[in-house]
């Protein structure tokens, strides 16, 4: 009867502890075999006095064996730096108690024994086998059997805390089991303000949200927001990677259990401290049917995770020490028939050292005006009033000329300039993507802006180069040079095949196509092809009906200057003597055989 009474009293204590909830946090009370209440476990109570907040859970007076715990000292918050190592030693204040835990899978209540925390320096090993703990003084199965002779020793797997600072210095591993009653937890932690100070208190405000519960799976998403995260250099935990960890003995384990009601989010703190975004994902498989295990079979271990603040942080206190996250061990880590599986994934993102206020604002000119290219000669060049610099023209071959477009602009061409521009036409019209200099009047493209500028003179009628012998003017210096050779009879360019000589190099290029049979210039209307661009220009005038050459005597018009010259012989005039009675083009310049564009016709 005594055992049944104690068992019913224990169940009542468990049920009462489940009802003591306030502000989304669960208060867990403990009881010993003699009925004397003691201090709740600091590793499972969210409002821990070690973190600067008083316990609001219903408590009673401490047991007679207590030597001065935090409950005896009142609800005042004590600084971490003033606490000695004995404050973290559960053997000095906390009697061997029966800790009450709430199992997630299936809603079953499980009972676990709470081991005393070990203080001092410990070593962690993250290998598969795990390292041995520095303290093996946990309660054995015999001690539990003497306390509860009729109850088997049952354990609960503790939940991995987000940022606990456990005095346990070892690491532990979990054995995989069958996923029967599984629970999946997803934590997102955003401590926007993290103040690293060795002597400050930790004042945290938290809220949680309880999501879904379907069948035997529960998904809980809790959001923990802390205004400041305390770090103190209390003890050393040396990991297996050889790096000295941060403060493992600075505070006890900290947990939060989500409830139906959520506390309001904390007010935003000042933006002067560096922030940290933490994404934590945990998958758990828990079972309520534990069997008796041997406490000495598997060494007690604690898993450890390190996080180091960014070294380039602007805050002077931000580079104090690293953060060690330690998880509490299993109480009886024997080989259970049904074991627990933990999967932990953390993603730490440190912010940039500069805040939003320090970033220079972008001006309209910076966003809309890109920087000019280094080589400005590669960009499209157009004279004033002719083209647009921002326009990149497509490639236009000489075979795509339209008769309607040529009827508007080709009246300014003369036969000699057409023949002199054969080489330029070959460079521009047959070019590819590297020739963006486009004439918007006739569609020709050129590789250089200077060549386009010279070509535009044929449309504008500008003729800055004049012959000193016959006062003829030309738009290009090369045309004037070729014209002067007609007076001197000089023909320096020769065909290597037939030894025929020419006064212009472009004439040799055109002549060589007669030997090779190449006809790159094709009419878009009748599909006829020609060896030079000037012949194609004359042919297109047949389709367009353009006749730029007019006789001054009878006002007859002709499409080619050669036809006008033959017409002038009908009038009995000597076309070679002077240009007083000769034909005059639309441009009004008096010269023998000249068209609108001016210049003479070379007949070889």
UniProtKB/Swiss-Prot annotation:
Residues 582-604 have a biased composition (Gly residues). PROSITE patterns: ZINC_FINGER_C2H2_1, ZINC_FINGER_C2H2_2. A zinc finger (C2H2-type) spans 437-459, 465-487, 493-515, 521-543, 549-571. Residues 111-139, 199-237, 359-400, 414-434, 566-604 are annotated as: Disordered. Keywords: DNA-binding, Metal-binding, Nucleus, Repeat, Sensory transduction, Transcription, Transcription regulation, Vision, Zinc, Zinc-finger. One of its GO terms (molecular function) is DNA binding. Pfam families: zf-C2H2. One of its GO terms (biological process) is sensory perception of sound. One of its GO terms (cellular component) is nucleus. Disulfide bonds: none annotated. Residues 414-427 have a biased composition (Acidic residues). It is found in: Nucleus. Residues 117-126, 200-237, 572-581 have a biased composition (Low complexity). Transcription factor required for gene expression specific to photoreceptor cells. This is Protein glass. It comes from Drosophila melanogaster. The gene is gl.
């Amino acid at each position: 009867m005594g055992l049944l009474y104690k068992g019913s009293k224990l169940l009542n204590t468990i049920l009462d502890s489940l009802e003591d909830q306030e502000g989304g946090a669960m208060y867990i009370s403990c009881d010993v075999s003699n009925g004397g209440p003691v201090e709740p476990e600091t590793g499972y109570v969210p409002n821990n006095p070690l973190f600067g907040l008083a316990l609001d859970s219903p408590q009673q007076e401490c047991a007679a064996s207590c030597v001065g715990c935090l409950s005896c000292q009142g609800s005042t918050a004590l600084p971490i730096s003033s606490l000695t190592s004995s404050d973290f030693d559960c053997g000095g204040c906390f009697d061997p108690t029966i800790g009450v835990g709430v199992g997630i899978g299936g809603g079953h209540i499980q009972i676990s024994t709470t081991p005393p925390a070990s203080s001092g320096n410990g070593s962690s090993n993250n290998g598969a086998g795990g390292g041995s703990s520095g303290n093996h003084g946990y309660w054995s199965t015999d001690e539990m059997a003497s306390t509860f002779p009729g109850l088997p020793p049952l354990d609960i797997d503790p939940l991995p805390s987000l940022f606990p600072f456990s005095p346990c210095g070892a690491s532990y591993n979990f054995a995989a089991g069958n996923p029967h009653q599984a629970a999946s937890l997803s934590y997102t932690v955003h401590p926007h303000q993290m103040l690293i100070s060795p002597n400050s208190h930790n004042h945290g405000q938290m809220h949680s949200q309880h999501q879904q519960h379907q069948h035997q799976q529960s998904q809980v998403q809790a959001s923990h927001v802390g205004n400041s995260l305390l770090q103190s250099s209390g003890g050393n935990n040396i990991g297996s990677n050889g790096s000295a960890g941060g403060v493992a003995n600075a505070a006890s384990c900290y947990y939060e259990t989500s409830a139906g009601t959520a506390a309001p989010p904390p007010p935003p703190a000042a933006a002067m401290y560096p922030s940290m975004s933490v994404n934590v994902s945990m998958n758990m498989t828990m079972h309520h049917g534990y069997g008796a295990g041997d406490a000495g079979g598997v060494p007690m271990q604690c898993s450890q995770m390190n996080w180091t603040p960014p070294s380039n942080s602007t805050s002077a206190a931000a580079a104090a020490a690293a953060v060690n996250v330690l998880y509490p061990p299993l109480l009886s880590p024997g080989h259970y028939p049904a074991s627990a599986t933990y999967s932990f994934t953390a993603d730490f993102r440190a912010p940039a050292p500069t805040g939003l206020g320090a970033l220079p604002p972008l001006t309209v000119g910076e966003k809309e005006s890109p920087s000019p290219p280094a080589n400005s000669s590669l960009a499209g060049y157009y004279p004033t009033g002719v083209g647009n610099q921002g326009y990149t023209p497509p490639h236009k071959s000489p075979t795509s000329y339209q008769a309607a477009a040529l009827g508007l602009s080709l009246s300014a061409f003369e036969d000699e300039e057409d023949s002199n521009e054969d080489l330029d036409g070959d460079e521009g019209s047959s070019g590819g993507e590297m020739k963006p200099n486009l004439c918007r009047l006739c569609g020709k493209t050129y590789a250089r802006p200077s060549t386009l500028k010279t070509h535009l003179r044929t449309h504008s009628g500008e003729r800055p180069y004049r012959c000193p012998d016959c006062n003829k003017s030309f738009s290009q210096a090369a045309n004037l040079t070729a014209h002067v050779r007609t007076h001197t009879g000089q023909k320096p360019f020769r065909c290597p095949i037939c030894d025929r000589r020419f006064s212009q190099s472009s004439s040799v290029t055109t002549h060589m196509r007669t030997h090779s049979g190449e006809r790159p210039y094709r009419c878009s209307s009748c599909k006829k092809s020609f060896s030079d661009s000037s012949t194609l220009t004359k042919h297109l005038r047949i389709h367009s009906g353009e006749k730029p050459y007019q006789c001054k005597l009878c006002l007859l018009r002709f499409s080619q200057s050669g036809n006008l010259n033959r017409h002038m012989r009908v009038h009995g005039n000597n076309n070679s003597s002077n240009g007083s009675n000769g034909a005059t083009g639309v441009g009004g310049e008096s010269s023998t055989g000249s068209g609108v564009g001016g210049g003479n016709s070379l007949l070889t």
